[in-house]
Each structure stands twice: as structure tokens, then as C-alpha cells.
């Protein structure tokens, strides 16, 4: 039987910065262990059925399927979340949205809305950090709502709920001190949609018209009806869209408009306060 070390050395994945790490995650998953097990027991022999499972995982990855979809989970903030192909994979850059939200409101009671929640990543991270906040996450995809609810139940979070809604459509009369969203913001003609992991992600969670701003425009237009006085709206957007989003916020009647940079130095999150 092959050893852990042999299988990792023999793993053939497309050359990329994450190829070695991808193989480790996939073998650990096939074994039902953590990646530290691989380093602790490199000479451990692997059962044939485990080797076959690992080979199947590798083939899916060679075809470009994201590791998160193969494993059915993804880390975000301090959380381990279930993911599925009908939801966007949570990304590290989106943690900036969480950090910004935590800075905007005090730790006391507040009603907070997460639009287009997907896996529930943003709402769940905020619920973890602010036990007094009452979080609502909405998504138009019923499967995403079910998945987000499963994540909340598994994490034991009682201060968050998830409901099906196309943006604000199911929230008549509801007002919040803070609204956050990582909406679709990729241009329909963007060639990156045909490359890498995004080929496997739902286009409805990625694409927003010819300039990538259709959903952001709608959210900024409708948010004042659902914000309390002096409430905040925080939006993630593309690396080159900050100026356009700030202009939309100013034109929408928001004040204290500004942007923050992500890990790569790009303005990735913009926000404003309702006058």
C-alpha cells in the first residue's frame, strides 16, 4: 500500500501556488483527518479505498473544480462553513466587510441585515462577534437559505435568522441600523468568468450587468427605505469600482462616504451613512 508521503509526492495537479496545499487538503479529507496528521505520519500506509477517494478528488481538482466544493466546506473569519455549488465560496477579502461592519456600530443591541447572504458567512461572522446584534440574512435562492440555516445551527448561533428574499422584497416595513452586502459586481463581459474557480460558481452570484453595478445601484436606491436614521450601508465591490460606488452613495443621499482597502491594496469596500 502507498504511504501518505508517496501519495502527496505523486499527486499531479496543475502548477499553481496552491497545488501542494490543495493536495494536502484533499488527502486529509479522503483520510477523514486534519492536515497536521499528514505531517505527523508521513510513512503511514493508506488503504486502497482511501487512495481511490483521493484520486477521485484529484481528478475533480484537475478539471478546475474548487477545493471548497470538493470538500463541501470553507473557512471564513473564525468559522468552518458548509458550502455548495449554489453559493459563492467565501473569500478572505470579504473579511474586510466584516471588520468594517464591526467598526460602524457599538456592541449593544442592533438590527443588522445581510443582503445576498449565500452561505451566511458575513452574517454568521457578525453574529459570532456581536451577541447582542440581531442578524437577518436574505438570499433569493432557497437552497442557499437552507444551507445558511444549517451553518447557523451547527455553530449554535441563536441571534441570526435567514429568509428567502430578492434583496428587500420580503422585508416591507423592516428597518436596520446597518445593512451589509457582498452583491454580484462582475461585468458580464469580464474574461475572468471563463477562468479558474469562478467557472464553477453560480453566475447569479457574480455577474451584475454590463458595468457590474446593476445590483449595487438597486441596493443603494432601496436601502434608505430600510435604514434607521444615521444607519450605515456597507458594500463590497470590484477592485476598480470604488469611485463609481462612492458616487452612487453620494447621489443616493448618503454622507460620510468612504472606502477601505483589501489585503492587496485595492479599495474593496465602500460605505456611507444615511443622512
Predicted segments with their positions:
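Non-catalytic nucleic-acid substrate-recognition regions in nucleic-acid-modifying enzymes
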Residues: 1-22
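Short helix-capping segments at alpha-helix termini
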Residues: 16-17, 130-132, 153-158, 226-227, ...
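Conserved SAM/SAH cofactor-binding pocket of Class I
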Residues: 92, 96-192, 197
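Conserved Class I SAM-dependent methyltransferase catalytic core
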Residues: 210-273
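Conserved AdoMet
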Residues: 25-103
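Mobile active-site "lid"/loop adjacent to the S-adenosyl-L-methionine
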Residues: 185-215
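Residue-level signal for inorganic ion chemistry
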Residues: 26, 64, 94, 122, ...
